[in-house]
């Protein structure tokens, strides 16, 4: 039966080899609460409810979009898994939750054990960076569904927060301060536009060395999404944070209002942090307007914290102790629930 299945395009033996290869990477992410090994039908996790008065589970799921196209073109697969984890756990920590475990879904045209191992190694690295366990996953070999050498990846995470410590943004008020944490680059959003402008329209190659970037274009674009979980949780232990914003698809313009109460707007002081060269390259090459840039990209800020003005200095100092590049980038004022930009001609 397995030989007939192999002739149909599904190689069970290759799948088994891939599982063996990934085991060492997966196991290094296991927290003490993990109760199962690889291979079970369902993964078990013992939540210590005694640590919480009213534990609330927080879930998130996401993928990495067309950044995958760059991994295919560069034949580099060991960091895209970090992106998959980052997109999920950064969303969960925004609620004040600690990510507990992560599951992945990987769909491929053909199982190549070495490639699967590289992808899962990246997922495990992302889990290690965020302190959550890679508790399970699915690798689906589906001949005829994907072009040769291509795959898709998605992730799912569950975290926990005590109800009294949930962060909702409900208390955000005029005078509060916005602190931005530096991104590592484009992260995992806006790549359809990046690819159109730089590759299709300008004819650049991913293997081109770009002086303003100091590296090959493909290396810059595949830089993994930063994971902010441990830093944010550390700040939450000692400081009140009214709201957190993960800058993903929709950029500043779409994401910041998601945490603002009615009657409050965010004022962003453009120029109060360094915009990364990759964004200047894309904007210049595509003649893209500032409104489009700030509605598409993170512009060098991957996570934002909203704090009381009297807490801003101590929060900044804490973040710097944790190795973060943190910037005071704006404030909250009364007005229509939206983002207002100072310092740039719109």
Swiss-Prot record:
Pathway it works in: Purine metabolism; IMP biosynthesis via de novo pathway; 5-amino-1-(5-phospho-D-ribosyl)imidazole from N(2)-formyl-N(1)-(5-phospho-D-ribosyl)glycinamide: step 2/2
Signal peptide: none
Coiled coil spans: none
Biological-process GO terms, alphabetical: 'de novo' IMP biosynthetic process; adenine biosynthetic process
Localization per record: Cytoplasm
Keyword Cell division found: no
Swiss-Prot/TrEMBL catalytic activity: 2-formamido-N(1)-(5-O-phospho-beta-D-ribosyl)acetamidine + ATP = 5-amino-1-(5-phospho-beta-D-ribosyl)imidazole + ADP + phosphate + H(+)
Gene Ontology terms, MF aspect: ATP binding; phosphoribosylamine-glycine ligase activity; phosphoribosylformylglycinamidine cyclo-ligase activity
Superkingdom to which the source organism belongs: Bacteria
Keyword Ligase in record: yes
Keywords noted in UniProt: ATP-binding, Cytoplasm, Ligase, Nucleotide-binding, Purine biosynthesis
Gene Ontology CC: one annotated term: cytosol
Top-level EC class: ligase
Principal subcellular localisation of the protein: cytoplasm
Family indicated by similarity: Belongs to the AIR synthase family.
PANTHER family: TRIFUNCTIONAL PURINE BIOSYNTHETIC PROTEIN ADENOSINE-3, TRIFUNCTIONAL PURINE BIOSYNTHETIC PROTEIN ADENOSINE-3-RELATED
Protein name: Phosphoribosylformylglycinamidine cyclo-ligase
Organism: Brevibacillus brevis (strain 47 / JCM 6285 / NBRC 100599)
